[in-house]
């Protein structure tokens, strides 16, 4: 069987499963999630052994430490994945929820009801936890899912997918509810992008290159999970202690994720006082600073920033820094370079905070908090399938509700249109 036929067969199985999943009862879906959780814990050693192979392969080709961190599983991360499944099982089922209902002059009772999207294709790279997170949210929201991970994590993903696929069938959901493409050839993605009628939506999760390729080449509708060139702006009215805590957290907690800070903007009135303080701390923590001309005059021994640096998602211990003359210049800089993911202002000035919130165009805009909070779990959604940076259908962390659409249900009593 060639690659095209292989992917089409998987999509057909997923389409059949999606029909049954669309009306599966909540108890069965929750049981499937609980069985998935148990199966992960019972097979922890096997998963770790397969993950070890992926890590060794990554190290052989010189993969960065930050990306290896995204790839790595350990006891705690698998336990966290299992616990997240239990949490998802406890969330309210969105399917069948009537968002609003009204009566027309013709005495028709009309309701707007949540329903699944159908078949969701997830194309992702080096994070094995996505295999579980995506499957869990799709199952709970009544969607079937086709998972296509990257070659970096193929052994980990294959092991996890086999385990959770068997678990959902054991729980009583149809075979095909979770499908996994175990061929890493790029052609599998090309086929998925052309399967209109079999796949309802594609969600790419990964680097800028992957996302751009899917968005530009897919005829199947795409929800774009954007890259994160996230900014923190230190206003002239900033509390320096707050600013330091937020910057250290936003840059260093997990530098290789999309909600990590990549660029620091500092108002000129506080730059001479604040930049030496924060740069000293960042250098201690092994962060490379790439600064504008004004920054270079204040902080010695840093790398000159290029225009490209200000638009780049580093996913590493690298930070671009720019001194700005005003709040307006900070907002304009963000407008020019932002990927519209997460942006933050540090200020004690209410007027400046409100202006930043109103004028900055991003999925999440913060006042005095870390960009690292842009996350489905942190927002109270119980996990996410990705963070959308587009404006149609969904924006920001995509939880269960964002994996649904609606239909109108109409109750009549013999009415005809006159």
Curated annotation (Swiss-Prot):
Regions crossing the membrane: none
Main location: cytoplasm
Keyword Oxidoreductase: yes
Source organism of the structure: Clostridium acetobutylicum (strain ATCC 824 / DSM 792 / JCM 1419 / IAM 19013 / LMG 5710 / NBRC 13948 / NRRL B-527 / VKM B-1787 / 2291 / W)
Pathway(s): Amino-acid biosynthesis; L-proline biosynthesis; L-glutamate 5-semialdehyde from L-glutamate: step 2/2
Lineage summary: Bacteria, Bacillati, Bacillota, Clostridia, Eubacteriales
Catalysis: reaction(s): L-glutamate 5-semialdehyde + phosphate + NADP(+) = L-glutamyl 5-phosphate + NADPH + H(+)
Function, as annotated: Catalyzes the NADPH-dependent reduction of L-glutamate 5-phosphate into L-glutamate 5-semialdehyde and phosphate. The product spontaneously undergoes cyclization to form 1-pyrroline-5-carboxylate.
Source domain of life: Bacteria
Protein name: Gamma-glutamyl phosphate reductase
């Amino acid at each position: 069987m060639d690659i095209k036929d292989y992917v089409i067969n998987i999509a057909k199985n997923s389409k059949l499963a999606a029909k049954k999943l669309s009306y599966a009862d909540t108890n069965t879906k929750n049981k499937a999630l609980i069985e998935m959780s148990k199966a992960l814990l019972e097979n922890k050693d096997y998963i770790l052994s397969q993950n070890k192979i992926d890590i060794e392969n990554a190290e052989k080709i010189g993969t960065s430490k930050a990306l290896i961190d995204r790839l790595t599983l350990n006891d705690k991360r698998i336990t966290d994945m299992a616990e997240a499944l239990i949490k998802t099982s406890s969330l309210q089922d969105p399917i069948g929820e009537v968002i609003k209902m009204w009566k027309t002059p013709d005495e028709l009772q009309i309701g707007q009801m949540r329903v699944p999207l159908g078949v969701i294709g997830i194309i992702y790279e080096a994070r094995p936890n996505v295999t579980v997170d995506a499957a869990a949210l799709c199952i709970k929201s009544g969607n079937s899912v086709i998972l296509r991970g990257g070659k970096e994590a193929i052994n980990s993903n294959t092991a996890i997918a086999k385990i959770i696929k068997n678990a959902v069938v054991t729980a009583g959901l149809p075979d095909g509810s979770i499908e996994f493409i175990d061929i890493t050839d790029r052609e599998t993605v090309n086929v998925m992008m052309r399967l209109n009628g079999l796949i309802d939506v594609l969600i790419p999760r990964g680097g800028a290159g992957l996302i751009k390729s899917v968005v530009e080449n897919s005829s199947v509708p795409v929800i774009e999970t954007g890259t994160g060139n996230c900014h923190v702006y230190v206003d002239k009215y900033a509390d320096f202690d707050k600013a330091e805590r937020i910057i250290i957290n936003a840059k260093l907690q997990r530098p290789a994720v999309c909600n990590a800070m990549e660029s620091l903007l500092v108002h000129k009135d506080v730059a001479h006082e604040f930049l030496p303080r924060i740069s000293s701390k960042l250098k201690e923590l092994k962060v490379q600073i790439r600064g504008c001309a004004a920054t270079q005059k204040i902080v010695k021994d840093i790398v000159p920033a290029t225009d490209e640096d200000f638009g780049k998602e580093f996913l590493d211990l690298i930070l671009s820094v720019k001194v700005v003359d005003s709040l307006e210049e900070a907002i304009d800089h963000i407008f020019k370079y932002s990927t519209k993911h997460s942006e933050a202002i540090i200020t004690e000035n209410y007027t400046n905070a409100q202006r930043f919130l109103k004028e900055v165009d991003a999925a999440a805009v913060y006042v005095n908090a870390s960009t690292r909070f842009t996350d489905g779990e942190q927002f109270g959604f119980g996990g996410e399938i990705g963070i959308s940076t587009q404006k149609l259908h969904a924006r920001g962390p995509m939880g269960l509700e964002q994996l649904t659409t609606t239909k109108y249900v109409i109750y009549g009593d013999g009415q005809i249109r006159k």
